[in-house]
Amino acid sequence: METKRNYKALVIPFIVLLAVLVIDQLVKIYIKTHFFLGEEVKVLGDWFRLHFTENYGMAFGLEFGGKSGKIILTAFRIAAVLFICRYMLEASRKKAHPLYLISWALILAGAVGNIIDSIFYGKYFGYDTWFHGRVVDMFYFPLIQTTIPENWPFWAGEEFEFFRPVFNVADAAISIGFVIIVIGQWFFFRERDRTRYRA
């Protein structure tokens, strides 16, 4: 009975997981079917754009070892997803803070979202085989675009841009999940210790 009560704590994280996955895939499929590769649409002037790009690799357009690396990366992602699932079950059993579980649900949703692209998109969209799909990215926030002064000792005269990486909903979910965990680390575990002490 106690175990069932603890696992109820995973209901909201599971809803968050499903919501992020659905939004991630809907946005990706829309971009994939309505934009041509490299197409860019300004949403908020030069600060926020939709820019359709694809990559074989990790979050924010980073790549890893070409096609052979793609298989390794996908296998690693699947192993990570299984580990996170097991960890969340264990954390819920230990009465982890709800926001802590939601944070891991965001990370899990992001990982699964990009795995779906990697495994299925190549075959579904007809450009490659299973496990060789490209991850669809679209959000581009070049918040700062400037030129480094000529009198600087390094990179003088070069263009500087922040934030350069193009990313997707899954990448954002992973990042938000990690940020919440890092910022709330002290609070999450202090709360758990207080609960254990009261028990």
Where are the model-predicted features located?
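Alpha-helical transmembrane bundles and membrane-interface segments of multipass inner-membrane proteins
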Residues: 1-199
